[in-house]
Amino acid sequence: MYRYVALRKRILGVDELHYYDVYAPLTKGVSAHYTYDQAKQMVLDAVAPLGEEYGTIVRKGFAERWIDVFPNKGKSGGAYSGGSYDSNPYIMCNFTGTLDSVSTIAHEMGHSMHSWFSRHTQPAQYADYTLFVAEVASTVNENLLIEHLLAEKNQDPATRLALLNQYLENFKGTVYRQTMFAEFERDAHAMAERGEALNPAALNNLYKKLIVDYFGPELVVDDEVQYEWARIPHFYRPFYVYKYATGYSTAVALSEGILK
């Protein structure tokens, strides 16, 4: 992470890198626009290493219109996969033709395929899966898509940089940041068990110290950053955020193993 912070400081060309600079885009993004048909083919090509059976069912999902694809009046934002034990899995997304939209389809199709295989191989009482593994299947697909696009010989430099930046951002946000959240949560509970006061000042100091430890000496940590813990809703559901980090790490290892 320290090397990433130093790299970000150099690319942005700033004398001081503040915490808010960690979220500034490093690239101009990808201007390419994809049709839904192109997106489907990109996903199918990306998941081909998972085998013929997997690819056949993904095609089935596209052909049978498991996906509510486009934004619409009154439609919720975001994306998710749902369904029940005796139905097909269904996906709600808001496809806009961006590379991020393509990645979202790959991600949500991973959830749906996880559900499909689980429901077709397990009785109802065992077919559900925990959060600990839920993000693995979806993120494997997402990573396979990135690797597939990076491997294209004629990929333009801007898109390649955007893909690499997305990979780095995923690691920062899902592995490092969620681990930092988990450590904050653990230490706050430990303070309570020792009988220490959990007042704002104590929690602010704990959070700010963790940011300094995780991001290193190249980052300027302004005083306002210490209050960030108070706006993070994950802490209302104790001791689960580490699962994002373990899930993403597992997905990266699996996708690399699949491609090798």
Listing of model-derived features with the role each one plays in the protein:
Residues M1-K260:
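Cation-handling catalytic/transport regions enriched in His/Asp/Glu
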